[in-house]
Amino acid sequence: MGVEISLDPPVCPIQANGGVSKHKMINHCDKILAFKVKSSNNSNYSVNLIYGILKVCDVKELVITRKPGKPQADKLIIQYCMVEDENADPKPLFANGVPPGELSGETVIKLSAAE
């Protein structure tokens, strides 16, 4: 398994006093992927996409928003798994916390708010 999903840019430079960072979420494989975006700090960070489907070589915009707060070592985790149907509902696939299937995994993005 390689890098199935990545973000461009791969880092999130948001100030501790708040802000917005826009990224491209890219599917690098030849499979349809369902995804779930999780944050280690839901008090300060939110995203425009929580669940979704990335078609083969698809790109979606992920907008990360930070509320003002103390800077700390936070991260976003993009869990993913292969699906056969691009119209599948991705939410139930992540109900157990671990994405199912042979082609599954996660991409971790470090969130480093600067003062």
Curated annotation (Swiss-Prot):
Gene3D superfamilies: Immunoglobulins (2.60.40.10). Signal peptide: none annotated. Residues 1-115 form the MSP domain. This is Uncharacterized protein ZK1307.3.
